[in-house]
């Protein structure tokens, strides 16, 4: 799996913007396979990370 930030840069799994490992962020992946992390109260979480499945 790879993650792209708002600029399209690949972020490594487990990196600071990896929503699957970041507390307070859940991945919301619709049938298309794309999703944005949902804000769940952790103010340190980025809002512009796209998860790639």
Swiss-Prot record:
How activity varies with pH? Stable from pH 2.0 to 12.0.
Thermal response of activity: Retains almost 100% of its activity after heating for 10 minutes at 70 degrees Celsius, activity is lost rapidly above 70 degrees Celsius.
Q: Where is this region: Disordered?
A: 33-53
Instruction: Kindly state which keywords UniProt assigns to this record, in alphabetical order.
Output: Disulfide bond, Protease inhibitor, Serine protease inhibitor
As one GO molecular function, the record gives: serine-type endopeptidase inhibitor activity
Chain coiled-coil ranges: none
Membership in a protein family: Belongs to the protease inhibitor I3 (leguminous Kunitz-type inhibitor) family.
What does this gene product do? Inhibits trypsin with a Ki of 0.25 uM. Inhibits the trypsin-like proteases in midguts of larval H.armigera, S.exigua, and P.rapae.
Other known facts = The reactive bond is likely to include a lysine residue.
Share what the entry says about its subunit structure, partners included.
Heterodimer of an alpha and a beta chain linked by a disulfide bond.
Protein name, please?
A: Kunitz-type trypsin inhibitor alpha chain
| Natural source organism | Albizia kalkora
């Amino acid at each position: 799996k790879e993650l792209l930030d708002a600029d399209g840069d690949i972020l490594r799994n487990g990196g600071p913007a990896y929503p699957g490992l970041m507390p307070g962020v859940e991945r919301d992946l619709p049938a298309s396979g794309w999703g944005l992390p949902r804000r769940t109260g952790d103010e340190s979480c980025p809002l512009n990370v796209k998860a790639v499945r």
